[in-house]
Amino acid sequence: MGTVVSLIASELMGLVDELVVMDSLSTDGTAEAARKAGAQVHSVADVRPDLGVRPGKGEALWKSLFVTTADLLVFIDADLTEWGTHFVTGLLGPLLTDPSVKLVRGFYDRVLDSGNVPSLEGGRVTELVARPWLALHRPQLSRVVQPLAGEWAIRRSVFEELSVPVGYGVELSTLLDVHASFGLDAIAQVDLGRRAHRHQSLHDLAVMATELMSVGERRRLWTLASPTVGVEGSGGTLGTAVLRLPAADRTWKVLPIPVDERPAAIGVEGYFRAQGFED
Protein backbone atom coordinates (compact mmCIF):
# COMPACT_ATOMS: atom_id res chain seq x y z
CA MET A 1 0.00 0.00 0.00
CA GLY A 2 2.86 2.38 0.72
CA THR A 3 4.09 1.99 -2.85
CA VAL A 4 0.62 2.62 -4.28
CA VAL A 5 0.23 5.78 -2.20
CA SER A 6 3.70 7.15 -2.91
CA LEU A 7 3.29 6.73 -6.67
CA ILE A 8 -0.06 8.54 -6.67
CA ALA A 9 1.32 11.26 -4.41
CA SER A 10 4.36 11.87 -6.59
CA GLU A 11 2.73 11.61 -10.03
CA LEU A 12 -0.92 12.60 -9.76
CA MET A 13 -1.42 15.20 -7.05
CA GLY A 14 -2.25 17.81 -9.68
CA LEU A 15 -5.24 15.64 -10.53
CA VAL A 16 -6.00 13.91 -7.23
CA ASP A 17 -7.30 16.26 -4.52
CA GLU A 18 -7.59 13.76 -1.69
CA LEU A 19 -5.57 10.59 -1.14
CA VAL A 20 -7.30 8.53 1.54
CA VAL A 21 -6.70 5.06 2.98
CA MET A 22 -9.45 3.39 4.99
CA ASP A 23 -7.84 1.03 7.48
CA SER A 24 -9.83 -1.89 8.87
CA LEU A 25 -7.67 -2.88 11.84
CA SER A 26 -4.75 -3.97 9.67
CA THR A 27 -1.83 -5.57 11.52
CA ASP A 28 0.71 -5.68 8.67
CA GLY A 29 1.89 -2.09 8.86
CA THR A 30 -0.36 -0.97 5.99
CA ALA A 31 -1.69 2.09 7.80
CA GLU A 32 1.71 3.38 8.89
CA ALA A 33 3.25 2.80 5.45
CA ALA A 34 0.38 4.67 3.79
CA ARG A 35 0.64 7.55 6.26
CA LYS A 36 4.38 7.91 5.70
CA ALA A 37 3.80 7.89 1.94
CA GLY A 38 1.45 10.86 2.20
CA ALA A 39 -2.07 9.49 2.55
CA GLN A 40 -4.74 10.54 5.00
CA VAL A 41 -5.36 7.34 6.96
CA HIS A 42 -8.65 6.77 8.74
CA SER A 43 -9.54 3.82 10.92
CA VAL A 44 -12.95 2.59 9.79
CA ALA A 45 -14.00 2.12 13.42
CA ASP A 46 -13.21 5.77 14.21
CA VAL A 47 -15.32 7.22 11.39
CA ARG A 48 -18.80 8.02 12.67
CA PRO A 49 -18.50 5.64 15.65
CA ASP A 50 -22.09 6.55 16.55
CA LEU A 51 -23.16 4.44 13.57
CA GLY A 52 -21.25 1.41 14.77
CA VAL A 53 -18.83 -0.60 12.68
CA ARG A 54 -19.34 -3.68 10.53
CA PRO A 55 -16.62 -5.89 9.11
CA GLY A 56 -16.05 -5.72 5.39
CA LYS A 57 -14.87 -3.85 2.32
CA GLY A 58 -18.18 -2.17 1.62
CA GLU A 59 -18.23 -0.71 5.12
CA ALA A 60 -14.87 0.96 4.47
CA LEU A 61 -16.02 2.42 1.16
CA TRP A 62 -19.32 3.66 2.63
CA LYS A 63 -17.55 5.34 5.54
CA SER A 64 -15.08 6.96 3.15
CA LEU A 65 -17.97 9.21 2.10
CA PHE A 66 -17.85 10.82 5.55
CA VAL A 67 -14.14 11.73 5.38
CA THR A 68 -13.86 12.89 1.76
CA THR A 69 -15.35 15.80 -0.17
CA ALA A 70 -14.35 15.22 -3.81
CA ASP A 71 -16.97 15.00 -6.54
CA LEU A 72 -15.35 11.99 -8.22
CA LEU A 73 -14.29 8.91 -6.26
CA VAL A 74 -11.74 6.32 -7.39
CA PHE A 75 -11.37 3.07 -5.44
CA ILE A 76 -8.21 0.95 -5.67
CA ASP A 77 -7.73 -2.38 -3.91
CA ALA A 78 -4.96 -2.47 -1.32
CA ASP A 79 -3.65 -5.93 -2.25
CA LEU A 80 -2.27 -5.07 -5.68
CA THR A 81 1.19 -6.41 -6.46
CA GLU A 82 1.36 -5.10 -10.03
CA TRP A 83 -0.25 -1.86 -11.17
CA GLY A 84 0.43 1.69 -12.39
CA THR A 85 -0.88 5.20 -11.80
CA HIS A 86 -2.67 4.92 -15.15
CA PHE A 87 -5.30 2.98 -13.18
CA VAL A 88 -6.36 6.27 -11.61
CA THR A 89 -6.23 8.42 -14.74
CA GLY A 90 -7.92 5.73 -16.79
CA LEU A 91 -10.83 5.39 -14.38
CA LEU A 92 -11.28 9.15 -14.08
CA GLY A 93 -11.18 9.78 -17.82
CA PRO A 94 -14.78 8.87 -18.74
CA LEU A 95 -16.18 10.78 -15.75
CA LEU A 96 -14.22 13.90 -16.68
CA THR A 97 -15.13 13.83 -20.37
CA ASP A 98 -18.72 12.54 -20.42
CA PRO A 99 -21.32 13.87 -17.94
CA SER A 100 -23.68 10.99 -18.74
CA VAL A 101 -21.24 8.42 -17.33
CA LYS A 102 -21.92 7.64 -13.67
CA LEU A 103 -19.79 4.53 -13.03
CA VAL A 104 -16.50 3.36 -14.53
CA ARG A 105 -15.38 -0.23 -14.08
CA GLY A 106 -11.85 -1.34 -14.88
CA PHE A 107 -10.83 -4.54 -16.61
CA TYR A 108 -7.39 -5.98 -17.21
CA ASP A 109 -5.33 -9.03 -17.95
CA ARG A 110 -5.19 -10.89 -14.66
CA VAL A 111 -1.89 -12.61 -13.95
CA LEU A 112 -2.69 -16.23 -13.15
CA ASP A 113 -0.61 -18.39 -10.84
CA SER A 114 0.24 -20.94 -13.52
CA GLY A 115 3.24 -19.73 -15.46
CA ASN A 116 2.59 -16.02 -15.02
CA VAL A 117 0.10 -16.21 -17.90
CA PRO A 118 -2.12 -13.14 -18.38
CA SER A 119 -5.83 -13.74 -18.99
CA LEU A 120 -8.98 -11.65 -19.44
CA GLU A 121 -10.89 -14.15 -17.31
CA GLY A 122 -12.21 -12.87 -14.02
CA GLY A 123 -11.47 -14.59 -10.73
CA ARG A 124 -13.15 -17.80 -9.66
CA VAL A 125 -16.07 -16.07 -7.98
CA THR A 126 -16.60 -13.88 -11.04
CA GLU A 127 -16.73 -16.83 -13.42
CA LEU A 128 -18.71 -19.23 -11.19
CA VAL A 129 -21.10 -16.86 -9.40
CA ALA A 130 -21.31 -13.30 -10.71
CA ARG A 131 -21.26 -13.91 -14.45
CA PRO A 132 -23.86 -16.72 -14.40
CA TRP A 133 -26.12 -14.62 -12.13
CA LEU A 134 -25.91 -11.66 -14.50
CA ALA A 135 -26.64 -13.90 -17.49
CA LEU A 136 -29.85 -15.05 -15.81
CA HIS A 137 -31.09 -11.84 -14.21
CA ARG A 138 -29.34 -8.86 -15.86
CA PRO A 139 -28.28 -10.06 -19.32
CA GLN A 140 -27.69 -6.46 -20.40
CA LEU A 141 -24.69 -6.46 -18.06
CA SER A 142 -23.20 -9.67 -19.44
CA ARG A 143 -20.77 -7.61 -21.54
CA VAL A 144 -19.13 -6.13 -18.47
CA VAL A 145 -15.74 -7.79 -18.72
CA GLN A 146 -14.97 -7.99 -15.00
CA PRO A 147 -18.08 -7.14 -12.98
CA LEU A 148 -16.30 -7.59 -9.65
CA ALA A 149 -13.19 -5.57 -10.47
CA GLY A 150 -11.90 -3.81 -7.36
CA GLU A 151 -10.72 -0.81 -9.36
CA TRP A 152 -13.58 1.51 -10.21
CA ALA A 153 -14.73 5.11 -10.11
CA ILE A 154 -18.10 6.73 -9.46
CA ARG A 155 -19.63 10.16 -9.04
CA ARG A 156 -20.17 11.08 -5.40
CA SER A 157 -23.65 12.33 -6.28
CA VAL A 158 -24.50 8.76 -7.33
CA PHE A 159 -22.65 6.74 -4.68
CA GLU A 160 -24.09 8.75 -1.80
CA GLU A 161 -27.59 7.78 -2.98
CA LEU A 162 -26.92 4.03 -2.98
CA SER A 163 -27.42 1.36 -0.37
CA VAL A 164 -24.02 -0.25 0.25
CA PRO A 165 -23.43 -3.88 1.31
CA VAL A 166 -20.88 -4.00 4.11
CA GLY A 167 -18.84 -6.81 2.59
CA TYR A 168 -17.53 -7.94 -0.78
CA GLY A 169 -20.84 -7.28 -2.52
CA VAL A 170 -20.19 -3.58 -2.99
CA GLU A 171 -18.84 -3.95 -6.54
CA LEU A 172 -21.83 -5.99 -7.69
CA SER A 173 -24.34 -3.77 -5.91
CA THR A 174 -23.04 -0.56 -7.49
CA LEU A 175 -23.10 -2.15 -10.93
CA LEU A 176 -26.68 -3.36 -10.50
CA ASP A 177 -27.97 -0.18 -8.88
CA VAL A 178 -26.41 2.23 -11.36
CA HIS A 179 -27.76 0.13 -14.22
CA ALA A 180 -31.23 0.07 -12.66
CA SER A 181 -31.32 3.81 -12.05
CA PHE A 182 -29.48 5.23 -15.08
CA GLY A 183 -29.31 2.51 -17.73
CA LEU A 184 -26.47 0.77 -19.50
CA ASP A 185 -25.08 3.90 -21.14
CA ALA A 186 -24.21 5.33 -17.71
CA ILE A 187 -21.59 2.59 -17.23
CA ALA A 188 -18.16 2.77 -18.88
CA GLN A 189 -15.35 0.22 -18.97
CA VAL A 190 -11.63 0.97 -19.18
CA ASP A 191 -8.84 -1.40 -20.17
CA LEU A 192 -6.21 -0.96 -17.46
CA GLY A 193 -3.68 -3.34 -18.98
CA ARG A 194 -2.30 -5.85 -16.52
CA ARG A 195 -3.04 -6.45 -12.87
CA ALA A 196 -1.69 -8.83 -10.23
CA HIS A 197 -2.87 -9.32 -6.67
CA ARG A 198 -2.81 -11.82 -3.85
CA HIS A 199 -5.08 -14.84 -4.25
CA GLN A 200 -7.51 -16.14 -1.64
CA SER A 201 -8.36 -19.63 -0.43
CA LEU A 202 -11.51 -21.43 -1.55
CA HIS A 203 -13.02 -20.97 1.91
CA ASP A 204 -12.47 -17.22 1.66
CA LEU A 205 -14.04 -17.26 -1.79
CA ALA A 206 -17.06 -19.14 -0.41
CA VAL A 207 -17.63 -16.22 1.96
CA MET A 208 -17.40 -13.79 -0.95
CA ALA A 209 -19.79 -15.87 -3.04
CA THR A 210 -22.35 -15.95 -0.23
CA GLU A 211 -22.24 -12.17 0.08
CA LEU A 212 -22.67 -11.76 -3.68
CA MET A 213 -25.67 -14.08 -3.74
CA SER A 214 -27.24 -12.02 -0.97
CA VAL A 215 -26.70 -8.81 -2.94
CA GLY A 216 -28.12 -10.29 -6.12
CA GLU A 217 -31.17 -11.84 -4.51
CA ARG A 218 -32.00 -8.70 -2.56
CA ARG A 219 -31.91 -6.59 -5.70
CA ARG A 220 -33.83 -9.14 -7.71
CA LEU A 221 -36.71 -8.66 -5.29
CA TRP A 222 -36.54 -4.87 -5.19
CA THR A 223 -38.63 -2.79 -7.58
CA LEU A 224 -37.28 0.21 -9.47
CA ALA A 225 -39.94 2.34 -7.83
CA SER A 226 -38.64 1.47 -4.38
CA PRO A 227 -34.92 0.68 -4.69
CA THR A 228 -34.22 0.98 -0.95
CA VAL A 229 -36.86 -1.38 0.40
CA GLY A 230 -35.61 -2.95 3.62
CA VAL A 231 -33.00 -0.32 4.42
CA GLU A 232 -33.83 0.79 7.93
CA GLY A 233 -32.66 4.04 9.50
CA SER A 234 -29.02 5.04 9.66
CA GLY A 235 -27.87 1.56 10.57
CA GLY A 236 -29.07 -0.12 7.39
CA THR A 237 -30.42 -3.63 7.03
CA LEU A 238 -29.41 -6.28 9.51
CA GLY A 239 -28.72 -9.88 8.64
CA THR A 240 -26.28 -12.74 8.96
CA ALA A 241 -25.92 -15.80 6.77
CA VAL A 242 -24.36 -18.91 8.30
CA LEU A 243 -21.99 -20.78 6.01
CA ARG A 244 -20.90 -24.29 6.98
CA LEU A 245 -17.72 -25.64 5.42
CA PRO A 246 -16.28 -29.14 6.00
CA ALA A 247 -13.04 -29.08 7.98
CA ALA A 248 -10.12 -31.51 7.72
CA ASP A 249 -10.99 -33.13 11.06
CA ARG A 250 -14.48 -34.07 9.75
CA THR A 251 -16.17 -31.34 11.73
CA TRP A 252 -17.91 -28.26 10.38
CA LYS A 253 -16.33 -24.85 10.17
CA VAL A 254 -19.18 -22.45 10.91
CA LEU A 255 -18.81 -18.96 9.48
CA PRO A 256 -21.34 -16.23 10.26
CA ILE A 257 -21.34 -13.85 7.30
CA PRO A 258 -22.79 -10.34 7.68
CA VAL A 259 -25.09 -9.52 4.78
CA ASP A 260 -26.01 -6.09 6.13
CA GLU A 261 -26.35 -3.05 3.92
CA ARG A 262 -25.67 0.51 4.91
CA PRO A 263 -28.30 3.01 3.76
CA ALA A 264 -27.72 5.83 1.31
CA ALA A 265 -25.22 8.12 3.03
CA ILE A 266 -27.08 11.21 1.89
CA GLY A 267 -29.93 10.32 4.24
CA VAL A 268 -27.72 9.80 7.30
CA GLU A 269 -27.83 12.59 9.88
CA GLY A 270 -24.60 14.57 9.86
CA TYR A 271 -23.54 13.58 6.34
CA PHE A 272 -23.90 17.08 4.94
CA ARG A 273 -21.92 18.50 7.86
CA ALA A 274 -19.07 16.22 6.83
CA GLN A 275 -19.21 17.92 3.42
CA GLY A 276 -19.13 21.38 4.98
CA PHE A 277 -22.87 22.07 4.69
CA GLU A 278 -25.73 22.23 7.15
CA ASP A 279 -28.03 19.20 7.33
Task: Give the positions of each predicted feature.
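Acceptor/aglycone-binding surface of glycosyltransferases and processive sugar-polymer synthases
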Residues: 49-53, 57, 61, 83-156
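A conserved acidic beta->alpha catalytic loop
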Residues: 23-32
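Short, acidic, metal-binding catalytic loop of nucleotide-sugar glycosyltransferases
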Residues: 6-16
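Conserved donor nucleotide-binding strand/loop of the catalytic core
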Residues: 17, 31-59
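Conserved catalytic loops of nucleotide-sugar-dependent glycosyltransferases that act on lipid-linked
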Residues: 118-215
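Active-site acidic Asp-centered loop
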Residues: 24, 76-79
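Short aromatic/hydrophobic "clamp" motif used to bind/position activated sugar donors
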Residues: 73
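Terminal low-complexity segments of carbohydrate-biosynthetic enzymes
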Residues: 200-279
